[in-house]
A protein has these predicted regions:
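Gly/Ser/Thr/Pro-rich low-complexity, intrinsically disordered segments
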Residues: 1-182
């Protein structure tokens, strides 16, 4: 008798309908809420960010800017919307980026294809390059989302709330920035 092992490397999460926003405070009534930019050990956001059209660039990095506009996002060297943050680009216009980091971790990305934006999350630890390749198979653009110690996130679908990374649930109040949909 033959057995077939089907390996599912990533899970796709559809976003609720609504405007993507970014905040340095966790919104209490969001239908989707996911950590976004990297932070240091004291919770300071690493990189420039933008809230309600105002720039905060004290910790600017060389990473690309991820602008949130309506229900879509844009990866660019300049801000293209009222909300945004700096983060690693995994896929840009169907070109998969390569990384030298060989550490394996559970990974998450904000992605888009011709049908719109969605979240991809690895089902087990993988390198950043392997995760970028998986994203490249499923989307035209992808930006990494911080998982770190505080990688809790959720998407509400009616009465169902699905934690994206259960270990982060207990430290969710330590995260300092979020992508969300009200």
């Amino acid at each position: 008798m033959a057995y077939i092992h089907i390996e599912k490397r990533v899970t796709r999460f559809e976003l609720p309908v609504g405007e993507l926003k970014w905040s340095n405070k966790r919104p209490q009534n969001a239908r989707m809420c996911i950590p976004a930019a990297f932070t240091d050990g004291r919770g300071r956001i690493l990189g420039a960010y933008r809230i309600n059209g105002k720039n905060y660039e004290a910790n600017k990095t060389m990473r690309m800017k991820v602008s949130l506009k309506g229900d879509m996002f844009f990866i660019s060297s300049k801000w293209m919307g009222d909300y945004g943050f700096q983060q690693l680009t995994l896929v840009n216009d169907s070109k998969v980026m390569k990384f030298h980091d060989t550490r394996k971790s559970v990974r998450r990305a904000l992605c888009k294809d011709k049908d719109g934006a969605f979240i991809l999350q690895s089902n087990y630890p993988m390198t950043m390059s392997d995760f970028a390749l998986e994203c490249g198979k499923r989307c035209t653009n992808a930006t990494y989302l911080d998982m770190g110690e505080y990688g809790y996130g959720y998407i509400k679908n009616g009465f169902f709330t699905r934690p994206l990374y259960i270990w982060g649930y207990f430290s969710r109040d330590k995260q300092t920035n979020w992508i969300y949909i009200e």
